[in-house]
Amino acid sequence: MLSRTVDSFDEMFDVVVVGYGFGGAVSALSAHDAGAEVLLAEKMPNPGGISICSGGGLRLPHDRDATFQYLKATNDGTTPDNILEAFMDEMVQIDEYVQELATVNGARIKRTERPGSYAFPGFDQMYFLQIDDIPDFDPKRDYAYANALSGGPFMFKVLQDNIAKRGIKTRLGVSAKRLITDDKGAVAGVWLDDG
């Protein structure tokens, strides 16, 4: 049984991100860009998680308030407004963020009108953003393990190249076994296993 507490650590990082798909990559980039020393750990031998096999697109708002009303309707009151407001505050910044990330490798961004899935007010105020081309990148060659047929590999390539450019440490083939806590129960680390 792995202990929940330890006397010392093998390595020290400000932030350890577990999982190297889209979410893990963006979390690692955000922590690094905020000044943290980051370790990005992935249990599989190759990065990408299931994200690399996804469509790789992001549905974004043309109109923040209309999209807020749409999301509020789709959640039918189950998500507090302050959570949806915080979500929208970040959602309206994603297009610019992806544009910035895409400069790392000259990725081409494609925007397509794509309304919401349900005919609630505001459903027609959204669009779809994807990476649809990267010079000298062939997803079937470069990510043969992913067997992806859609845009996921393109978005992941942009994220992976940004991770590499920033020199963020990554570990593949290591799994998180247990969180390590201090004597007050606060998380102080993570037990990673490469076996």
Task: Write out the residue ranges for each language-model feature.
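Acidic, glycine-rich active-site loops and adjacent beta-strand->loop/helix elements
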Residues: G21, M44-N46, G57, A176-R178
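Glycine-rich FAD pyrophosphate-binding loop
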Residues: D33-S54
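N-terminal Rossmann-like FAD-binding beta1-loop-alpha1 element of flavoenzymes
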Residues: F13-L40
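A short, basic/flexible loop-to-alpha-helix module at the beginning of a structural domain
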Residues: M1-M12
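Short coil/turn connectors at secondary-structure junctions
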Residues: M12-F13, A34-E37, G55, R166, ...
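Glycine-rich active-site loop/strand segments that organize a redox cofactor
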Residues: L58-E90
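Conserved redox-cofactor binding core of oxidoreductases
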Residues: D89-G195
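Gly/Ser/Thr-rich helix-start
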Residues: F22-A25, G49-I50, G57-L58, V190
